[in-house]
């Protein structure tokens, strides 16, 4: 029985990039190669308009499952490559149709003849191929307007592609074409979604997490590591910077009026993140803030917090409500990790009545009464950095079985 031997990838938004298109295509090819490195027999050919993945016996479903998380892919088709001969095309169309797993009652044939010397015209091919499918199936009808399946055939010189199983890609742009940002990764629901949406725009991310032992536990730290690990599904790797924040936070709570401790804490986080960003050649800072969600996420708060950094602060979730954010978190696999009941440093020292309209002048005046510089430098110097890469699910299961 014939089976899929190719996957054809369509780029989507990348096609609008003009002179930079070759860079985008090259980056996408590198990302796909990295994502599919566990399939040693495949061959990848990335052209100006499309990417062709030759399977060479590898499992098409496993490859399709990996491809769906690669940013820069609009859609992809499971395909068969057959000689450009009528009988072979007919057999291929039937075989592709029979591989469809969902219930199908109607179909249509679409033919694109880029090889104009093929001996039959498109309007001659449609009934010929469609009739062959009808003759060899039962309870199936042709519906050219709203079919359950569209059997698409591309006829070229020497060979043709036949496809009818179309899958959606992740969309966006290839990770790596848009520079690098530092993402404040708290361990909550919002910040992993912000990281995901930032990567979707082609930006590489490194994560910064502030932890305050013994007020925050090792389990809370592991939760953030697991979140960063989950995000590697969408890129080659995530570098995670774990910043010890205990002394800074204790000093803030001692020296700063309680209504401003949250604001000053955020300002200190921004200062530390900016220093790490400078060392790592990042160009911006991403946060998971959503306008009005909590006291520290009002416009006044953001205005006051932004004062301490010259870096652009990206807020992908700024107009989303909580349910929209949770929906994405569920889709990308971070929600169940985020809701593990472990405290982070933003919640263990939460004041009873935080200022919702903090002023820059007040925050600066409160900070000026104590020299925080040595504490910030110590936090940066003692930051632990780890690099996380995608773990194959089968390998992960095998590892867990050892215990």
Swiss-Prot record:
Its EC number is 2.8.1.4. One of its GO terms (cellular component) is cytosol. Keywords: ATP-binding, Cytoplasm, Nucleotide-binding, RNA-binding, Thiamine biosynthesis, Transferase, tRNA-binding. GO terms for molecular function: ATP binding; CCA tRNA nucleotidyltransferase activity; tRNA binding; tRNA-uracil-4 sulfurtransferase activity. InterPro entries: Rossmann-like_a/b/a_fold, ThiI_AANH, ThiI_fer, ThiI_N, THUMP_dom, THUMP_ThiI, tRNA_STrfase, tRNA_sulfurtransferase_ThiI. Catalyzes the ATP-dependent transfer of a sulfur to tRNA to produce 4-thiouridine in position 8 of tRNAs, which functions as a near-UV photosensor. Also catalyzes the transfer of sulfur to the sulfur carrier protein ThiS, forming ThiS-thiocarboxylate. This is a step in the synthesis of thiazole, in the thiamine biosynthesis pathway. The sulfur is donated as persulfide by IscS. This is Probable tRNA sulfurtransferase. It comes from Bacillus cytotoxicus (strain DSM 22905 / CIP 110041 / 391-98 / NVH 391-98). The gene is thiI.
